[in-house]
């Protein structure tokens, strides 16, 4: 009798556990540094509490937060945790993700028996933004060796670009280039001179240039060449244009004929 009762209790516990499964989505997530993300945790059953853990490679899970009240919202710096009103779901939102946020995120629901039911986890990978090193590029006119332009780009916003003491060298103020097609911005400045011995290595002498700035060798300067693209007409497009012109002429003739007939009727 006691054995049957114990087996019945065991089956009840197993049935309760089987209905307390947690589903996490997405299972894998890879984003760039600075982006936002949301991880979801759902169940068909009600939990008395819900916990979020983060596990880094080679280490054990670390508790981030515990929520117990339906509709509860907790914030931990850039992390926001929310427990659903029905206590069946939860979400983790990370703002401006950093490479240090990389890891496995686990949600765990607590039942009335005091045990925890874990989800399968969400593996997050945050790729760091690789800022390009500052560089100076020299552009020479292919038709005249006396004309040269230096482009100083990808430098830090704290860098000061000063005018040259040489009256024959002209330097623009620091500007921000918005590379919308590549989704990033870059600081830049331009220097130019008509002097034949003008060198980019000396153009920004009065400015504080980072030590890791790339300077091209005199042999590796870029020749600016004018490339003329040949223009070829499209026969189909030409036919369509001629058709439109023809229809317009026909419309004008019809309108003129109608106007002439109307004037004749009025005059008679």
From Swiss-Prot:
- Name the segments for region: Connecting peptide: 222-243
Tissue-level expression: Expressed in M/matrix protein 1-specific effector and memory CD8-positive T cells readily detectable in the peripheral blood, secondary lymphoid organs and lung (primary site of infection) of IAV infected individuals.
UniProt entry keywords in alphabetical sequence: Adaptive immunity, Cell membrane, Disulfide bond, Glycoprotein, Immunity, Membrane, Signal, Transmembrane, Transmembrane helix
Signal peptide boundaries: 1-19
Q: Which domain of life is it from?
A: Eukaryota
Subcellular compartments: Cell membrane
The transmembrane residues are 244-266
Annotated spans, T cell receptor alpha joining 42: 110-128
The stretches that face the Cytoplasmic side, renumbered to this chain, are 267-268
Please give the biological process terms from Gene Ontology that the record holds.
Answer: adaptive immune response; T cell activation involved in immune response
The Ig-like C1-type domain sits at 147-235
Carbohydrate-modified residues are: 36, 42, 160, 194, 205, 241
Q: How does it assemble?
A: Disulfide-linked heterodimer with TRBV19*01J2S7*01C*02 beta chain. The TR primarily interacts via its CDR3-beta domain with M/matrix protein 1-derived peptide (GILGFVFTL) displayed by HLA-A*02.01 in a 'peg-notch' recognition mode. The alpha-beta TR associates with the transmembrane signaling CD3 coreceptor proteins to form the TR-CD3 (TCR).
Chain's gene name:
TRA
Q: What is this protein called?
A: M1-specific T cell receptor alpha chain
Which residue stretches belong to region T cell receptor alpha constant?
129-268
How does the entry describe the domains? The complementarity-determining region CDR1 confers specificity to the peptide antigen. Assumes a loop structure that makes contact with HLA-A*02.01 and contributes to the stability of the TR through interaction with CDR3-beta loop.
Q: Name one Pfam family in it.
A: DUF1968
Species of origin reads: Homo sapiens (Human)
């Amino acid at each position: 009798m006691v054995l049957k009762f114990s087996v019945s209790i065991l089956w009840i516990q197993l049935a309760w556990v089987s209905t307390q499964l947690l589903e996490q989505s997405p299972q894998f997530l890879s984003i760039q540094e600075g982006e936002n993300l949301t991880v979801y945790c759902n169940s068909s059953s009600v939990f008395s509490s819900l916990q979020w853990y983060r596990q880094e490679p080679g280490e054990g899970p670390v508790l981030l937060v515990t929520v117990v009240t339906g509709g509860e919202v907790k914030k931990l710096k850039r992390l926001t945790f929310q427990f659903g009103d029905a206590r069946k779901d939860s979400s983790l939102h990370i703002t401006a993700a950093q490479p240090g946020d990389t890891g496995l995120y686990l949600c765990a629901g607590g039942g009335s028996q005091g045990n925890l039911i874990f989800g399968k986890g969400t593996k997050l990978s945050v790729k760091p933004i690789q800022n390009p090193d500052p560089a100076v590029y020299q552009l020479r006119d292919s038709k005249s060796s006396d004309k040269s332009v230096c482009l100083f780009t990808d430098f830090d916003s704290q860098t000061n670009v000063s005018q040259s003491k040489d009256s024959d060298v002209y330097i623009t103020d620091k500007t921000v280039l918005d590379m919308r097609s590549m989704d990033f911005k870059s600081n830049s400045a331009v220097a130019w001179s008509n002097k034949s011995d003008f060198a980019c290595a000396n153009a920004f002498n009065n400015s504080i240039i980072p030590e890791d700035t790339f300077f091209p060798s005199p042999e590796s300067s870029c020749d600016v060449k004018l490339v003329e693209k040949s223009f070829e007409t499209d026969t189909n497009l030409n036919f369509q244009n001629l058709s439109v012109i023809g229809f317009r002429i026909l419309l004008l003739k019809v309108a003129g004929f109608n106007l002439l007939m109307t004037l004749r009727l009025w005059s008679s």
